[in-house]
């Protein structure tokens, strides 16, 4: 659905038609991604009692309007959507950068639950990745694949188009692959490139520097001590082999958390568990929400 907000025309993807009588589950994608992340999840068990929504944040997907540069501004955009749809006490699910937006939102609105997947805090992004994201997004995505992917899924992921942004990501010419962000030769391991396509395509955006903008906002995002101590109804999903957002049991966010009940560590997966091990990821989310 398309919503006309004060400063944006917001695109909200619905897995089923929105029903105001149902509790809403809101997905907030990672840096440079959009609503198409929902193509990686199967949450049919939750359809009867829940709306499952994927937000295109400013500069992402099909949301139009001014780019915003901070986690806080993205949270305010989400609040505008909640107000227009009259969404009360949502279940927030954010992956990576989107997990920071979800965390910040949980300090601003009443929420039934917030699930932060694969986040670090502070979430510090290195200069090399920032430079790649600014100059050649294809290099940045390759960096994320190199350090973020631990294994490929057992079953090949069948992707849906989700509109024009899901098609034509690569153009081939004389053994090279041309993406919107650069040209490279993949003759050494073309099968790897094909296997990664369902995930890589999610970074294809009309706003070519949006990943850079998102990643910079990770570095500057901080909660106050009062906000951290006041966090409630927060659940965390980490990945055993995640090199981009490593689980640290001593992290300040986790000091007042019941580690047995509120933290799940997915085994043998990296930073993108919904790609690497979708069934286990779906089971984890459903078990948390149904508990």
Model-derived regions: residue spans:
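N-terminal cap/lid segment of alpha/beta-hydrolase-fold proteins
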Residues: 1-9
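Active-site loop/oxyanion-hole signature of alpha/beta-hydrolase fold enzymes
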Residues: 8, 47, 51-93, 97, ...
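Conserved HGGG/HGGXW glycine-rich cap/lid loop of the alpha/beta-hydrolase fold
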Residues: 8-64
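Conserved alpha/beta-hydrolase "nucleophile elbow" surrounding the catalytic nucleophile
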Residues: 29-31, 90, 94-96, 239
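Conserved loop-alpha-helix segment in the C-terminal half of the alpha/beta-hydrolase fold
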Residues: 44, 230-269
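Conserved hydrolase catalytic core segment
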Residues: 88-125
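Conserved alpha/beta-hydrolase catalytic His-Asp/Glu region
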Residues: 131-230
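Catalytic histidine-centered segment of alpha/beta-hydrolase-like enzymes
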Residues: 244, 269-282
């Amino acid at each position: 659905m398309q919503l006309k907000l004060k400063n944006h025309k917001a695109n909200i993807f619905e897995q089923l038609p929105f029903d105001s009588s149902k509790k809403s589950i809101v997905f907030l994608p990672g840096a440079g991604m959009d609503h198409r992340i929902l193509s990686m999840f199967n949450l049919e068990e939750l359809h009867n009692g829940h709306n499952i929504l994927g937000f295109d944040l400013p500069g992402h997907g099909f949301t139009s309007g001014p780019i915003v540069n901070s986690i806080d501004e993205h949270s305010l955009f989400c609040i505008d959507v909640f107000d227009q749809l009259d969404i009360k006490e949502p279940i927030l699910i954010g992956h990576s950068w989107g997990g920071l937006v979800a965390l910040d939102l949980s300090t601003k609105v009443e929420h039934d639950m917030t699930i932060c997947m694969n986040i670090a805090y502070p979430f510090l992004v290195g200069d090399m990745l920032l430079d790649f994201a600014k100059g050649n997004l294809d290099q940045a995505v390759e960096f994320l694949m190199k350090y973020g992917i631990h294994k490929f899924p057992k079953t090949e992921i069948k992707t849906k188009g989700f509109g024009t942004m899901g098609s034509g990501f690569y153009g081939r010419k004389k053994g090279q692959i041309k993406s919107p962000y650069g040209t490279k030769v993949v003759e050494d391991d073309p099968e790897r490139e094909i296997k990664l396509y369902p995930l890589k395509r999610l970074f294809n955006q009309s706003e070519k520097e949006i990943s850079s903008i998102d990643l910079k906002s990770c570095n500057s995002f901080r909660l106050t001590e009062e906000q951290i101590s006041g966090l409630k109804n927060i659940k965390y999903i980490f990945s055993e082999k995640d090199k981009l957002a490593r689980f640290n049991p001593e992290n300040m966010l986790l000091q007042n958390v019941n580690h047995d009940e509120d933290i799940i560590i997915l085994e043998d997966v990296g930073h993108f568990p919904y790609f690497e091990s979708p069934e286990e990821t779906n089971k984890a989310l459903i078990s948390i929400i149904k508990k």
